[in-house]
Protein backbone atom coordinates (compact mmCIF):
# COMPACT_ATOMS: atom_id res chain seq x y z
CA UNK A 1 0.00 0.00 0.00
CA UNK A 2 1.30 3.45 -0.94
CA UNK A 3 1.07 6.01 1.85
CA UNK A 4 0.75 9.58 0.63
CA UNK A 5 2.73 12.13 2.58
CA UNK A 6 2.19 15.88 2.78
CA UNK A 7 5.79 16.52 3.84
CA UNK A 8 7.65 19.00 1.68
CA UNK A 9 10.76 17.63 0.02
CA UNK A 10 14.12 19.40 0.10
CA UNK A 11 16.92 18.55 -2.32
CA UNK A 12 20.51 19.24 -1.31
CA UNK A 13 22.43 19.63 -4.58
CA UNK A 14 26.22 19.25 -4.34
CA UNK A 15 28.47 19.18 -7.44
CA UNK A 16 31.64 17.22 -6.66
CA UNK A 17 34.97 16.91 -8.43
CA UNK A 18 37.80 14.90 -6.82
CA UNK A 19 36.32 15.31 -3.34
CA UNK A 20 37.05 11.84 -1.92
CA UNK A 21 38.70 13.34 1.17
CA UNK A 22 35.78 15.67 1.92
CA UNK A 23 32.81 13.36 1.37
CA UNK A 24 32.72 11.59 4.80
CA UNK A 25 32.87 14.88 6.72
CA UNK A 26 30.42 16.53 4.34
CA UNK A 27 27.94 13.66 4.66
CA UNK A 28 28.02 13.82 8.47
CA UNK A 29 27.33 17.57 8.44
CA UNK A 30 24.46 17.05 6.00
CA UNK A 31 22.94 14.29 8.15
CA UNK A 32 23.04 16.62 11.17
CA UNK A 33 21.12 19.16 9.09
CA UNK A 34 18.60 16.54 7.98
CA UNK A 35 18.04 15.28 11.54
CA UNK A 36 17.42 18.81 12.80
CA UNK A 37 14.69 19.29 10.20
CA UNK A 38 12.76 16.03 10.35
CA UNK A 39 9.56 17.81 9.27
CA UNK A 40 10.87 17.65 5.69
CA UNK A 41 11.56 14.79 3.35
CA UNK A 42 15.16 14.99 2.14
CA UNK A 43 17.11 14.15 -0.99
CA UNK A 44 20.91 14.47 -0.98
CA UNK A 45 21.87 14.72 -4.64
CA UNK A 46 25.52 14.61 -5.66
CA UNK A 47 26.65 15.36 -9.22
CA UNK A 48 30.01 13.74 -9.93
CA UNK A 49 31.66 15.92 -12.55
CA UNK A 50 34.05 13.36 -14.04
CA UNK A 51 36.22 12.89 -10.95
CA UNK A 52 39.50 11.04 -11.48
CA UNK A 53 39.84 9.81 -7.87
CA UNK A 54 37.55 7.50 -5.87
CA UNK A 55 34.74 10.04 -5.49
CA UNK A 56 32.31 7.86 -7.47
CA UNK A 57 33.04 4.80 -5.32
CA UNK A 58 32.46 6.88 -2.18
CA UNK A 59 29.10 8.05 -3.54
CA UNK A 60 28.09 4.46 -4.29
CA UNK A 61 28.89 3.44 -0.71
CA UNK A 62 26.87 6.34 0.66
CA UNK A 63 23.97 5.35 -1.59
CA UNK A 64 24.09 1.76 -0.29
CA UNK A 65 23.86 2.85 3.34
CA UNK A 66 21.39 5.72 2.86
CA UNK A 67 18.73 5.71 0.12
CA UNK A 68 18.20 9.44 0.59
CA UNK A 69 21.51 9.82 -1.23
CA UNK A 70 21.23 10.00 -5.01
CA UNK A 71 24.03 10.66 -7.45
CA UNK A 72 24.40 11.60 -11.09
CA UNK A 73 27.68 10.59 -12.70
CA UNK A 74 28.62 12.67 -15.73
CA UNK A 75 30.51 10.93 -18.54
CA UNK A 76 33.44 13.38 -18.23
CA UNK A 77 34.37 16.66 -16.62
CA UNK A 78 31.94 19.27 -17.97
CA UNK A 79 32.64 21.95 -15.35
CA UNK A 80 30.76 23.08 -12.27
CA UNK A 81 28.34 25.31 -14.17
CA UNK A 82 27.10 22.38 -16.27
CA UNK A 83 27.12 20.05 -13.25
CA UNK A 84 24.66 22.37 -11.53
CA UNK A 85 22.35 22.20 -14.55
CA UNK A 86 22.48 18.40 -14.38
CA UNK A 87 21.54 18.64 -10.72
CA UNK A 88 18.55 20.84 -11.53
CA UNK A 89 17.44 18.27 -14.12
CA UNK A 90 17.50 15.41 -11.62
CA UNK A 91 16.38 17.27 -8.46
CA UNK A 92 12.94 16.16 -7.23
CA UNK A 93 12.43 18.42 -4.22
CA UNK A 94 9.94 21.22 -3.67
CA UNK A 95 13.02 23.36 -3.17
CA UNK A 96 16.69 22.87 -3.99
CA UNK A 97 19.68 23.98 -1.93
CA UNK A 98 22.84 24.44 -4.02
CA UNK A 99 26.09 24.20 -2.07
CA UNK A 100 29.77 23.36 -2.54
CA UNK A 101 31.36 20.18 -1.24
CA UNK A 102 34.26 21.92 0.52
CA UNK A 103 32.10 23.07 3.48
CA UNK A 104 33.15 26.68 3.05
CA UNK A 105 29.40 27.17 2.69
CA UNK A 106 28.12 26.01 6.11
CA UNK A 107 25.14 23.60 5.96
CA UNK A 108 23.91 25.14 9.22
CA UNK A 109 22.79 28.18 7.22
CA UNK A 110 20.18 26.06 5.45
CA UNK A 111 17.96 26.15 8.58
CA UNK A 112 17.53 29.90 8.17
CA UNK A 113 17.02 29.53 4.42
CA UNK A 114 14.16 27.12 5.04
CA UNK A 115 12.51 29.62 7.38
CA UNK A 116 12.56 32.32 4.69
CA UNK A 117 11.33 29.81 2.11
CA UNK A 118 8.34 29.03 4.30
CA UNK A 119 7.65 32.79 4.43
CA UNK A 120 7.28 32.80 0.66
CA UNK A 121 10.70 33.75 -0.74
CA UNK A 122 11.78 31.92 -3.90
CA UNK A 123 15.55 32.51 -3.94
CA UNK A 124 17.33 32.78 -0.60
CA UNK A 125 21.02 33.40 -1.28
CA UNK A 126 24.02 33.57 1.05
CA UNK A 127 26.08 36.76 0.84
CA UNK A 128 29.67 36.65 2.09
CA UNK A 129 30.79 39.21 4.67
CA UNK A 130 34.31 37.77 4.64
CA UNK A 131 35.89 35.48 2.06
CA UNK A 132 37.96 33.05 4.14
CA UNK A 133 41.38 32.05 2.84
CA UNK A 134 41.23 34.03 -0.40
CA UNK A 135 44.32 36.06 -1.21
CA UNK A 136 44.28 39.85 -1.44
CA UNK A 137 44.92 39.69 -5.20
CA UNK A 138 42.03 37.30 -5.82
CA UNK A 139 39.73 39.42 -3.67
CA UNK A 140 40.63 42.56 -5.63
CA UNK A 141 40.16 40.73 -8.93
CA UNK A 142 36.70 39.66 -7.79
CA UNK A 143 35.73 43.19 -6.79
CA UNK A 144 36.97 44.59 -10.10
CA UNK A 145 35.11 41.92 -12.09
CA UNK A 146 31.78 42.54 -10.36
CA UNK A 147 32.25 46.29 -10.72
CA UNK A 148 32.81 45.94 -14.47
CA UNK A 149 29.95 43.47 -14.87
CA UNK A 150 27.53 45.72 -12.97
CA UNK A 151 28.30 48.62 -15.32
CA UNK A 152 28.08 46.53 -18.48
CA UNK A 153 25.03 44.41 -17.69
CA UNK A 154 21.39 45.46 -17.65
CA UNK A 155 20.62 43.14 -14.74
CA UNK A 156 21.81 43.46 -11.16
CA UNK A 157 24.63 40.91 -10.70
CA UNK A 158 25.13 40.66 -6.95
CA UNK A 159 28.72 40.94 -5.62
CA UNK A 160 30.04 38.60 -2.89
CA UNK A 161 27.30 36.11 -3.72
CA UNK A 162 28.13 32.62 -4.94
CA UNK A 163 26.04 29.58 -5.80
CA UNK A 164 25.09 28.79 -2.18
CA UNK A 165 21.33 29.34 -2.05
CA UNK A 166 17.89 27.81 -1.70
CA UNK A 167 15.73 27.83 -4.82
CA UNK A 168 12.01 27.19 -4.93
CA UNK A 169 10.80 24.51 -7.35
CA UNK A 170 9.62 27.08 -9.87
CA UNK A 171 13.10 28.64 -9.97
CA UNK A 172 14.57 25.21 -10.65
CA UNK A 173 12.07 24.54 -13.45
CA UNK A 174 12.90 27.92 -15.00
CA UNK A 175 16.65 27.26 -14.84
CA UNK A 176 16.12 23.91 -16.54
CA UNK A 177 14.85 25.74 -19.61
CA UNK A 178 18.05 27.79 -19.96
CA UNK A 179 20.22 25.33 -21.89
CA UNK A 180 23.05 27.50 -23.21
CA UNK A 181 26.40 25.73 -23.49
CA UNK A 182 28.57 28.51 -22.10
CA UNK A 183 26.96 29.13 -18.74
CA UNK A 184 27.34 31.75 -16.04
CA UNK A 185 24.89 30.48 -13.45
CA UNK A 186 25.40 33.32 -10.96
CA UNK A 187 24.08 35.66 -13.63
CA UNK A 188 21.21 33.31 -14.49
CA UNK A 189 20.10 33.31 -10.85
CA UNK A 190 19.72 37.09 -11.10
CA UNK A 191 18.25 37.02 -14.62
CA UNK A 192 15.27 34.78 -13.75
CA UNK A 193 14.06 37.18 -11.09
CA UNK A 194 11.51 35.97 -8.51
CA UNK A 195 11.36 37.08 -4.89
CA UNK A 196 14.82 37.09 -3.34
CA UNK A 197 16.21 37.28 0.19
CA UNK A 198 19.83 37.56 1.32
CA UNK A 199 21.52 36.02 4.36
CA UNK A 200 24.96 37.31 5.33
CA UNK A 201 27.62 34.95 6.64
CA UNK A 202 31.38 34.67 7.19
CA UNK A 203 32.82 32.17 4.76
CA UNK A 204 35.26 29.75 6.36
CA UNK A 205 38.42 28.16 5.01
CA UNK A 206 38.45 24.90 3.12
CA UNK A 207 38.82 22.06 5.65
CA UNK A 208 41.03 19.82 3.51
CA UNK A 209 42.31 19.42 -0.02
CA UNK A 210 42.67 22.35 -2.39
CA UNK A 211 40.41 24.21 -4.75
CA UNK A 212 40.49 23.28 -8.44
CA UNK A 213 39.68 26.91 -9.34
CA UNK A 214 42.97 28.45 -10.43
CA UNK A 215 43.42 31.95 -11.82
CA UNK A 216 42.94 30.92 -15.46
CA UNK A 217 39.65 29.17 -14.68
CA UNK A 218 38.43 32.21 -12.76
CA UNK A 219 39.47 34.47 -15.65
CA UNK A 220 37.58 32.26 -18.09
CA UNK A 221 34.51 32.40 -15.83
CA UNK A 222 34.80 36.19 -15.78
CA UNK A 223 34.85 36.29 -19.59
CA UNK A 224 31.82 33.98 -19.66
CA UNK A 225 29.99 36.28 -17.27
CA UNK A 226 30.66 39.42 -19.29
CA UNK A 227 29.92 37.90 -22.71
CA UNK A 228 26.80 36.12 -21.41
CA UNK A 229 25.10 39.21 -20.06
CA UNK A 230 26.44 42.17 -22.00
CA UNK A 231 27.25 43.33 -25.52
CA UNK A 232 29.11 46.32 -24.11
CA UNK A 233 32.54 44.98 -25.23
CA UNK A 234 31.32 45.09 -28.84
CA UNK A 235 30.21 48.67 -28.35
CA UNK A 236 33.54 49.55 -26.75
CA UNK A 237 35.30 48.16 -29.82
CA UNK A 238 33.04 50.26 -32.04
CA UNK A 239 33.71 53.41 -30.01
CA UNK A 240 37.47 52.74 -30.13
CA UNK A 241 37.27 52.39 -33.91
CA UNK A 242 35.37 55.66 -34.27
CA UNK A 243 37.76 57.51 -31.95
CA UNK A 244 40.78 56.17 -33.83
CA UNK A 245 39.28 57.28 -37.15
CA UNK A 246 38.54 60.77 -35.83
CA UNK A 247 42.01 61.04 -34.26
CA UNK A 248 43.67 59.92 -37.50
CA UNK A 249 41.67 62.48 -39.49
CA UNK A 250 42.57 65.31 -37.09
CA UNK A 251 46.20 64.16 -37.13
CA UNK A 252 46.25 64.25 -40.95
CA UNK A 253 44.68 67.75 -41.05
CA UNK A 254 47.26 68.97 -38.52
CA UNK A 255 50.23 67.81 -40.59
CA UNK A 256 48.64 69.07 -43.82
CA UNK A 257 48.23 72.57 -42.39
CA UNK A 258 51.70 72.47 -40.85
CA UNK A 259 53.27 71.50 -44.17
CA UNK A 260 51.28 73.97 -46.35
CA UNK A 261 51.53 77.02 -44.09
CA UNK A 262 54.97 76.58 -42.55
CA UNK A 263 56.73 74.30 -45.00
CA UNK A 264 57.77 71.89 -42.25
CA UNK A 265 58.87 68.48 -43.38
CA UNK A 266 56.95 65.60 -41.83
CA UNK A 267 58.95 62.80 -40.25
CA UNK A 268 56.94 60.21 -42.13
CA UNK A 269 58.43 56.84 -41.26
CA UNK A 270 58.33 56.96 -37.42
CA UNK A 271 54.89 58.57 -37.48
CA UNK A 272 53.60 55.97 -39.92
CA UNK A 273 54.91 53.07 -37.83
CA UNK A 274 53.37 54.45 -34.62
CA UNK A 275 49.99 54.99 -36.27
CA UNK A 276 50.04 51.54 -37.90
CA UNK A 277 50.93 49.78 -34.65
CA UNK A 278 48.25 51.69 -32.77
CA UNK A 279 45.52 50.97 -35.30
CA UNK A 280 46.68 47.36 -35.67
CA UNK A 281 46.40 46.85 -31.92
CA UNK A 282 42.89 48.30 -31.90
CA UNK A 283 41.88 46.04 -34.80
CA UNK A 284 43.23 42.89 -33.15
CA UNK A 285 41.56 43.82 -29.87
CA UNK A 286 38.25 44.35 -31.66
CA UNK A 287 38.59 41.10 -33.60
CA UNK A 288 39.26 39.25 -30.35
CA UNK A 289 36.06 40.60 -28.82
CA UNK A 290 34.05 39.74 -31.93
CA UNK A 291 35.65 36.29 -31.91
CA UNK A 292 34.42 35.64 -28.36
CA UNK A 293 30.83 36.31 -29.37
CA UNK A 294 31.10 34.44 -32.68
CA UNK A 295 32.59 31.48 -30.82
CA UNK A 296 29.64 31.43 -28.43
CA UNK A 297 27.21 31.52 -31.36
CA UNK A 298 29.10 28.65 -33.03
CA UNK A 299 28.87 26.49 -29.91
CA UNK A 300 25.17 27.16 -29.47
CA UNK A 301 24.23 26.49 -33.10
CA UNK A 302 25.81 23.02 -33.05
CA UNK A 303 22.94 21.90 -30.86
CA UNK A 304 24.94 19.42 -28.79
CA UNK A 305 23.55 18.38 -25.40
CA UNK A 306 24.90 20.43 -22.53
CA UNK A 307 26.08 17.29 -20.74
CA UNK A 308 25.92 13.50 -20.91
CA UNK A 309 25.02 11.53 -17.79
CA UNK A 310 26.68 8.13 -17.51
CA UNK A 311 24.90 6.87 -14.38
CA UNK A 312 22.01 7.79 -12.14
CA UNK A 313 22.41 5.73 -8.99
CA UNK A 314 22.53 2.09 -10.11
CA UNK A 315 21.08 2.85 -13.55
CA UNK A 316 23.38 3.10 -16.56
CA UNK A 317 22.40 5.95 -18.85
CA UNK A 318 24.92 7.01 -21.47
CA UNK A 319 22.73 9.76 -22.90
CA UNK A 320 21.64 13.28 -22.10
CA UNK A 321 18.43 13.88 -20.23
Predicted features and spans:
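Short conserved micro-motifs on helix faces and helix-strand junctions that flank
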Residues: 15, 74-76, 165, 238, ...
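Residues in soluble alpha-helical coiled-coils and helical-bundle/repeat scaffolds
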Residues: 17-21, 104, 108, 176, ...
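Hydrophobic helical membrane-anchoring modules
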Residues: 2-7, 184-321
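Conserved amphipathic alpha-helical interaction elements at protein-protein interfaces in regulatory
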Residues: 18, 32, 36, 61, ...
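Acceptor/aglycone-binding surface of glycosyltransferases and processive sugar-polymer synthases
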Residues: 61, 72-76, 80-90, 106-188, ...
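Structured catalytic core of nucleotide-sugar glycosyltransferases
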Residues: 2-133
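Residue-level signature of catalytic and energy-coupling elements of molecular machines
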Residues: 30, 87, 102, 124, ...
